[in-house]
């Protein structure tokens, strides 16, 4: 028994004492296999889940390392049944393997005959299986490779996919490392992905996920399809690939509403390929338009359901998912595991910050008090309207102006979800507003002006949550969001984490109406960043800025 920062409980929850001197080391040790559930001020609650354990196993952690981490940092003896359960759960990964058989094609091989018998009796899985070759091997229809993995995960037997990949159409790509080089963690991430064949790389916003993608493309040396969140991100990818690799402008195509170019490297958006015409997903054929050797899913946690369905049919292609967080608010993390692949590499945000590759950040929650009339409007509103009402209270505008006055020389993003609120803020601050309806050309011109320092403040909607490179943004003020979305909170902080030319830090303000749904959702949103070691400082609007009204 030691005076460690963890209390490990038999219900698979792990309590972390935040103020303990070893809290940071303990958090890093349990992060690969435990998920943060609650993060109040002094004690954080994590849960050890099967999916987290299997992701850890696929990323190279074994049960001995997991047990050692818990025992080393636990204040009291770790319940022995829990340790046994961890060993048993992690041993389930890989008990079934998908293997290419030279005579029979795709097969499911069991290292435990009883497990195969259980699978063969499953009414959903059995129709996807073919002839039984021997006691431990059964044929799998190649078209069912993805769906079999999904269903096996659901019954608690995640299969290790060792069936290999088709190389696709060859297209040589090399990195041009003149004046720059891959950082150690970027190289390790690309190597880990390549060794696993398919899977997800998790890196903080601003840590250079695009370069991990470029390194993977160089390893593949094949035609590549890249799927991103929006057209601005697509063009950013193109600029980066032209600058950092042997690819020329003519080798990279854009498949969008404006252009329909299919080239050796083609970049499209999730919105484009899931657009329906007369009820049909016409552009899903992009997946079959070339013999792609690699498919890259940027911001993989946002993968729409139709793309999941198509990805189930693409299991012979190498697939790389890039993201800052594996959290999906729809709970479909298991589908990412099955269809894109398990987590291959994960770097804690604070580790990358300590190396100087992302800026240190301070997170501040500013609590405002609604006026009597605002409180009455909130109290009498229909339930579905209450969050919008408390998120957009007029009281917040004076607070935002005061925050900006505290940072007159810093480039600032004001971020929200409700367009009326953003338009009002834009008018009050004299700042341009970027939202979904803003033309792509105007959007890019404003982002460029912001990068050059010609525009000091931008008011942005959800369109700026993802993949926008604004290195000198040092202050972000969040006024409203998508309910309790943890991944949105992480992405928004990520907008200001690029290292600054002056080596300075960043400040992320979240302006929240107290005693309301706004405050409840804010607490939920902060969970992921708490898991990464970011603490929120709570400030009262009146104390911090003087009376807001």
Curated annotation (Swiss-Prot):
GO terms for molecular function: ATP binding; DNA binding; helicase activity; hydrolase activity. Its EC number is 5.6.2.4. Keywords: ATP-binding, DNA-binding, Helicase, Hydrolase, Isomerase, Magnesium, Manganese, Nucleotide-binding. It catalyses: Couples ATP hydrolysis with the unwinding of duplex DNA by translocating in the 3'-5' direction; ATP + H2O = ADP + phosphate + H(+). Changing residue 299 to A: Loss of ATPase activity. Coiled coil: none annotated. SUPFAM superfamilies: P-loop containing nucleoside triphosphate hydrolases (SSF52540). Belongs to the helicase family. RAD25/XPB subfamily. Removal of the N-terminus decreases solubility and/or structural integrity of the protein. NCBIfam families: repair_heli_XPB. This is DNA 3'-5' helicase XPB.
